[in-house]
Design a protein with these regions (language model features):
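Residue-level signal for inorganic ion chemistry
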Residues: 22, 26-29, 50, 61, ...
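Solvent-exposed alpha-helices and their adjacent loops that cap or buttress functional pockets
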Residues: 38, 78-80, 113, 131, ...
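Generic detector of well-ordered alpha-helical packing
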Residues: 51, 74, 90-93, 124, ...
Length: 256
């Protein structure tokens, strides 16, 4: 099996810096009474801050990495001429953002021929971030980030954006087994897993830009990321991040 090469440290540093700046731009609008919000056809809120942050990131990425593609939530994809693409979600957790809840995040990832090479989760309202580069480890403000070693469902903190879309009575089974279930979801839930504060994060329905950073962040932190069918992909429409020991057991319960 071919081992993918480490990503360039400078590329990771630029990604972290750009996403922090994009996060600062969203903070200017956070909890403002005059926050401008549009709605998509499905009712999902799109604050003006979302569009502003995506536009900023696209402009900066085009300047620093010409030819790289971009996949974002709010604008059409930019094709790649380099074999690389950036995947971004300027505000992950728009409902939290528009309600003044500080658990929203900014997400940025770089994908190359070997898979996701760079991943950043920025939590601007909390003053936290988690980032990783392939072969460079996973990091937070507190230093190296590692998943927990909790190996039993009993006592495991399991996050989810929603338990309503879990199959059957899975949530009830886990609750009866002693798991601690919390809906601290979106990028925040993944950050909790990567830093050892939660054992798992379950996302029943996602788009690629919702989970772009997660494969490299979880891998470099010592955990695992797959979709709910068990594939190591951000294209599967779902996501499961764990500390590793609980992954197969949760997959068996959650597999569609």
């Amino acid at each position: 099996m071919t081992i993918a090469p480490p990503v360039d440290q400078a590329t990771l540093d630029v990604a972290v810096a750009l996403l922090r700046e994009a996060g600062d731009r969203t903070l200017r609008w956070f909890r403002r009474d005059d926050l401008e919000v549009h709605r998509k056809a499905d009712g999902t809120p799109v604050p003006a801050a979302d569009r502003d942050a995506e536009r900023f990131l696209r402009e900066q990425l085009a300047e620093r990495f010409p030819g790289d593609g971009v996949l974002g939530e709010e604008e059409s994809p930019t094709p790649s001429t380099t074999g690389r693409r950036w995947i971004l979600d300027p505000i992950d957790g728009t409902k939290a953002f528009t309600c003044g809840v500080p658990l929203y995040s900014n997400l940025l990832a770089l994908e190359d021929e070997h898979g996701i090479a760079v991943g950043v989760i920025n939590l601007p309202a909390l003053g936290e971030a988690v980032w990783a580069g392939r072969g460079l480890g996973c990091w937070s403000e507190r230093g190296p980030a590692r998943v927990s070693d909790h190996a039993e469902v009993a006592g495991a903190f399991i996050m989810s954006s929603s338990f309503m879309r879990w199959p059957g009575d899975t949530a009830l089974q886990l609750d009866r087994s002693g798991a601690v279930l919390r809906t601290w979801g979106d990028g925040y839930g993944y950050a909790l897993v990567a830093t050892g504060r939660a054992a798992a994060m379950v996302d029943p329905v996602v788009e690629p830009y919702d989970v772009g950073p997660m494969p490299v962040i979880l891998a470099e932190a010592g955990g695992r990321f797959t979709d709910l069918a068990g594939a190591e992909s951000i294209e599967g429409g779902s996501g499961l991040a764990t500390n590793g020991p609980l992954h197969d057991e949760l997959l068996a319960l959650l597999r569609p």
